[in-house]
């Protein structure tokens, strides 16, 4: 008997949905006898053979977990007092288990379909309420990428809104976190903004500035009263942004109360691990008058078609996918999973618990300071929250060495001073250890005596007087039982990958395997400070080095930066690399970016941020780039041509055959080619952008490489470049290349990189290629099954699509009055998340099934779409009323079902249109949400829900 003793490649069948027999049946329906034959037909001749991925074996799940455990063990976990915007904290176990580790939360998509997203929308509304309450500003968004990028967004926000229109200078306090200042400088330079860093206490003339950024408390620990300075800036028509510590705001006068126009910062210390720098949720709050200029997403209260309160993403017309190069920001994701952790941390602890945590940290800091003075050390701060700077003169270097020998990290400031930041995890024993470390032989202070005598380090003028978190949601769920049930109740309202396929085109909602997710909650990855000494992060260095090599192999590029913490940031970093390359050659005049008309709105928004002028090129009737129009515009602008941004496979879901020619045209006219990697899931192992003409691409690790979407973030958007662009990859103060940071931490959202490392390691090169082939097979199977019911808008010359297909519903709108929205909402009644609506073409649905979906699930979706087409036909021929029909009224709720029924169609047709739903039915918690009402009556914080329910 021959038994296969190898466990190699066992994961591939776990990741890929179709079984072997089903795979062959799908191939037969397309007229192919093998995956290789299908691939050969889909991939254009001009780019065949460009893949450089070695088709090796994948590790078993057990082997991969053992390997990454060994890597994690190389990280050294010291007791860290570095601070600087990153603080250790406790993630409450019920939040860890019921939210962070729960696929109902982490596999969900951005809540663009509000009827199936009420749970996480409520959690995000809690987050917005938390931020609004603590900051003292009425409007807060649903999170941004990190504190550094939030500060950069605040700077450009001030530039747009300041009445000091002639100014191009932005004042940034020298007391801001250094990494924030670095991100500001990167963002400012292409926009012609001059960032002036200085000591706000010595600022005499504020008239040159359109805005200012102040840190509260200061990075070194000082607490300044900014009231008078804020008034001076306002008198000069400048806006004031304040980077504020969220936990400190439970004790401090909030920025909104001393006149700030914007408050930004990080919610990391609300239960989110350090994670070597990320991912963490940043926040952004502002005045009501400025809400339409605020970057990022905003959850608002509206009503459904029954008049019942319902939540939705508000004011989306201000976002980049609508406004393109006129957008206020290129941000198209948030940090929803992390914002929801912070939200639930506040819900669990409540106002009293949060205040107690802050008071304990502050009290320990005050006791520590008193003891240090007793020991003869000079503490620079007279007022503080949790951070102290010590003047240690010639002892500084020796003290750092002594501390590290004891497993302690202190903050490195300069040769004369060091810093200490306490946090939620600090204890009395820790304070006594610090005294011992710094005592220089002197007897230790008496902790109890100092604790009895110590006074607050917060001046009375800065002590918070206003109440926080009075809404019932922050005052109810303080037992674990209550919180567990609240999280379950919210999760049950939503549709995520744990229940159903999410066939969103251009979003790649594939499996996020449990084995890939397990390492992210290990302390070896989660408890490391991003600015810990390099020798303590050997595991992360190995992980990132190996992952960069893996991504180079998958793309054909020569170098990779993992720093960008979203696809939008990757785009931005890629265009900055192109810009810097041209400048290094004396080609400063090259500032034209060609972008096809079909491009995602992020592309032109990013080009604008990178200081480039956008020239739009045409597409032909098949949806491909019009090569002759591209050639004409490249020649017309050849003296100023910087770049082409193009998505491949195309935004229309097709492998364009002219891609090599397109790249050649740009290169011949002095430009660089940016290939947007949003659709990389169709290419891995089959062709490589770095080998068929791309100079730079960003990848979406949250699409192609299995990092979950988290309900709207986190994402990771690394960029791959050819060797000539490698010197211009993002730098960071903690790296060898110090310049060009695009986010606050050197490796961005480092703690979720193990997910991609695990995926690639378990799939191996052969598995990655097979995943691409199955993604193409699944998309073409759906396209073929549905083409006789709905026109497939674009195909290649062979009649095939890439990894997604676009169904054209516009003729049905004309014949029946049924819109793409009606079909999307009707799919909810069948238990499906809708495909991507009206992108890249209005009135269409773009479907991307990914390789992870089984034939059964594909058939279930196709059956639903075919049944919906039959319902549309019934509207067309008059069998169903054109206004009162299952599509116009979708989705149908349980409350409607048991209420008085007045529709001319049956209850059964409404909620059980196919028999399989009887076995397991998803019930939407609300009916169709009224978008217009929500924007006209904008409410973005919690109290209104109660008032609406009482009304």
UniProtKB/Swiss-Prot annotation:
One term of GO molecular function: glycine binding
Class of enzymatic activity (EC top level): oxidoreductase
Spans traversing the lipid bilayer: none
Annotated positions of the N6-(pyridoxal phosphate)lysine modification: 703
Listed EC numbers: 1.4.4.2
Reaction it catalyzes: N(6)-[(R)-lipoyl]-L-lysyl-[glycine-cleavage complex H protein] + glycine + H(+) = N(6)-[(R)-S(8)-aminomethyldihydrolipoyl]-L-lysyl-[glycine-cleavage complex H protein] + CO2
Keywords, comma-separated and alphabetical: Oxidoreductase, Pyridoxal phosphate
Swiss-Prot/TrEMBL cofactor(s): pyridoxal 5'-phosphate
One Gene Ontology cellular component: glycine cleavage complex
UniProt-listed GO biological process terms: glycine decarboxylation via glycine cleavage system
Pfam families hit by this protein: GcvP2_C, GDC-P
Record function comment: The glycine cleavage system catalyzes the degradation of glycine. The P protein binds the alpha-amino group of glycine through its pyridoxal phosphate cofactor; CO(2) is released and the remaining methylamine moiety is then transferred to the lipoamide cofactor of the H protein.
Classification via NCBIfam families: gcvP, PRK04366.1
Database matches in PANTHER family: GLYCINE DEHYDROGENASE (DECARBOXYLATING), MITOCHONDRIAL (PTHR11773:SF1), GLYCINE DEHYDROGENASE, DECARBOXYLATING (PTHR11773)
Protein family per UniProt: Belongs to the GcvP family.
The protein's assembly and partners: The glycine cleavage system is composed of four proteins: P, T, L and H.
Protein name, as recorded: Glycine dehydrogenase (decarboxylating) 1
Natural source organism: Pseudomonas fluorescens (strain ATCC BAA-477 / NRRL B-23932 / Pf-5)
């Amino acid at each position: 008997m021959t038994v296969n003793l190898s466990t190699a490649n066992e994961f591939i069948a776990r990741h890929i949905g179709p079984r072997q027999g089903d795979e062959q049946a799908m191939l037969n329906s397309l007229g192919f006898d093998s995956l290789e034959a299908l691939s050969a037909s889909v991939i254009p001749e001009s780019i065949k053979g460009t893949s450089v991925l070695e088709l090796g074996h994948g590790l078993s799940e057990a082997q991969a977990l053992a390997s990454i455990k060994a890597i994690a063990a190389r990280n050294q976990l010291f007791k860290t007092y570095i601070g600087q915007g990153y603080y250790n904290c406790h993630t409450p176990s019920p939040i860890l288990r019921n939210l962070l580790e729960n696929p109902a939360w982490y596999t969900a998509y951005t809540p663009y379909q509000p009827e199936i997203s009420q749970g996480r929308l409520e959690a995000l509304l809690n987050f917005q309420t938390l931020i609004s309450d603590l900051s003292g500003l009425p409007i807060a968004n649903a999170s941004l990428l990190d504190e550094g990028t939030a500060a950069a967004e605040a700077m450009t926000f001030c530039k747009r809104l300041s009445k000091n229109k002639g100014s191009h200078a932005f004042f940034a306090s020298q007391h801001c976190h250094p990494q924030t200042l670095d991100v500001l400088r990167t963002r400012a330079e292409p926009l012609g903004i001059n960032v002036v860093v200085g000591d706000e206490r010595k600022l005499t003339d504020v008239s040159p500035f359109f805005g200012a950024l102040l840190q509260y408390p200061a990075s070194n620990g000082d607490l300044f009263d900014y009231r008078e300075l804020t008034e001076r800036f306002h008198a000069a028509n400048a806006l004031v942004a304040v980077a504020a510590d969220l936990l400190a705001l439970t004790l401090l006068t909030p920025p909104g109360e001393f006149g700030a126009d914007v408050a930004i910062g990080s919610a990391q210390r609300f239960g989110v691990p350090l994670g070597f720098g990320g991912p963490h949720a940043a926040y952004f709050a502002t005045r009501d008058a400025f809400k339409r200029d605020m970057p990022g997403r905003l959850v608002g209260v509206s009503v459904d078609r029954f008049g019942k309160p319902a939540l939705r993403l508000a004011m989306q017309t201000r976002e980049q996918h609508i406004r393109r190069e006129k957008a206020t920001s290129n941000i198209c994701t948030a940090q929803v999973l992390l914002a929801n952790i912070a939200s639930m941390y506040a819900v669990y602890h409540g106002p009293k618990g949060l205040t107690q945590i802050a008071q304990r940290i502050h009290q320990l800091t005050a006791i520590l300071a008193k003891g240090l003075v007793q020991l003869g050390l000079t503490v620079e701060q007279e007022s503080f929250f949790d951070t102290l700077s010590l003047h240690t003169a010639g002892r500084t270097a020796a003290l750092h060495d002594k501390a590290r020998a004891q497993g302690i990290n202190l903050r490195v400031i300069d040769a004369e001073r060091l810093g200490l930041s306490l946090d939620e995890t600090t204890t009395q024993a820790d304070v006594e250890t610090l005294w011992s470390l710094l005592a220089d032989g002197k007897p230790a202070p008496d902790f109890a005596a100092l604790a009895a005598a110590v006074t607050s380090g917060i001046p009375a003028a800065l002590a918070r007087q206003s109440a926080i978190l009075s809404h019932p949601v922050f005052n109810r769920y303080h037992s674990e039982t209550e919180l567990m049930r609240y999280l379950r109740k919210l999760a049950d309202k939503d549709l995520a990958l744990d229940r159903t396929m999410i066939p969103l085109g251009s979003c790649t909602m594939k499996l996020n395997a449990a084995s890939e997710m397990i390492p992210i909650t290990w302390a070896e990855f989660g408890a490391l400070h991003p600015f810990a000494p390099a020798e303590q992060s050997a595991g992360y260095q190995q992980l990132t080095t190996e992952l960069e090599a893996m991504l180079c192999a998958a793309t054909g590029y020569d170098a990779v930066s993992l720093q960008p913490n979203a696809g939008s940031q990757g785009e931005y970093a890629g265009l900055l690399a192109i810009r810097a390359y041209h400048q290094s050659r004396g080609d400063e005049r090259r500032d034209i970016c060609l972008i096809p008309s079909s491009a995602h709105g992020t592309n032109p928004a990013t080009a604008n941020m990178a200081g480039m002028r956008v020239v739009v090129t045409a597409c032909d009737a098949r949806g491909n780039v019009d090569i002759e129009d591209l050639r004409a515009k490249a020649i017309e602008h050849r003296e100023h041509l910087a770049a082409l941004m193009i998505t491949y496979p195309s935004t229309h879901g097709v492998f364009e055959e002219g891609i090599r020619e397109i790249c050649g045209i740009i290169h011949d006219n002095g430009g660089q080619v940016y290939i947007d990697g949003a659709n990389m899931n169709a290419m891995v192992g089959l062709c490589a952008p770095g080998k068929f003409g791309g100079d730079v691409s960003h990848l979406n690790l949250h699409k192609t490489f299995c990092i979950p979407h988290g309900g709207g973030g986190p994402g990771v958007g690394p960029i791959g470049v050819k060797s000539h662009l490698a010197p211009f990859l993002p730098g960071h103060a903690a790296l060898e290349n110090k310049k060009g940071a695009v986010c606050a931490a050197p490796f961005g959202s480092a703690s979720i990189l193990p997910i991609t490392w695990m995926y690639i390691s378990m799939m191996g090169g052969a598995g990655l290629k097979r995943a691409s082939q199955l993604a193409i097979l699944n998309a073409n199977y759906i396209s073929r099954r549905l083409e006789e019911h709905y026109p497939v808008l674009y195909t290649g010359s062979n009649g095939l699509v890439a990894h997604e297909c676009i169904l054209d519903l516009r003729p049905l709108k004309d014949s029946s009055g049924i819109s793409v929205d009606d079909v999307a909402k009707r799919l909810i009644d069948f238990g499906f998340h809708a495909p991507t609506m009206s992108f890249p073409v209005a009135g269409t649905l773009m479907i991307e099934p990914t390789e992870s979906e089984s034939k059964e699930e594909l058939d279930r979706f196709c059956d639903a779409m075919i049944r919906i087409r039959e319902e549309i036909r019934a509207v067309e021929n008059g069998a169903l009323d054109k206004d009162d029909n299952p599509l116009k009224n979708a989705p149908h709720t349980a409350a409607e079902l048991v209420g008085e029924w007045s529709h001319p169609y049956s209850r059964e047709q409404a909620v059980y249109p196919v028999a399989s739903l009887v076995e397991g039915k998803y019930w939407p918690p609300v009916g169709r949400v009224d978008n217009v009402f929500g924007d006209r009556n904008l409410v973005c914080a919690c109290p209104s829900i109660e008032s609406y329910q009482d009304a």
